[in-house]
Regions:
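A domain-level signal for the structural core that forms small-molecule/cofactor-binding pockets
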Residues: 2-68
Length: 68
């Protein structure tokens, strides 16, 4: 038989820019804990990516957040 495949959980957070590094640290820690709890993954297996977007690059209901 072959080797067992390891699936690494990846959480991608897309949000408007403006959060502090400390807020992002807390978010990443909490997300990692939740993923470990519900998937059985170890801490080293959980990846979290944060993608910050400016208000001129995000819209809701046809209106840029920049214009709100």
């Amino acid at each position: 038989m072959g080797e067992q495949e390891v699936v690494v959980p990846l959480v991608v957070v897309k949000m408007l820019e403006g959060r502090s590094v400390e807020q992002k640290r807390r978010l990443v820690r909490e997300l990692t804990n939740v993923v470990m709890k519900y998937t059985g993954a170890t801490e080293d297996q959980v990846d979290v990516m944060i993608e910050d977007y400016s208000k001129e690059n995000w819209a809701k209901a046809g209106v840029l957040f920049y214009d709100k």
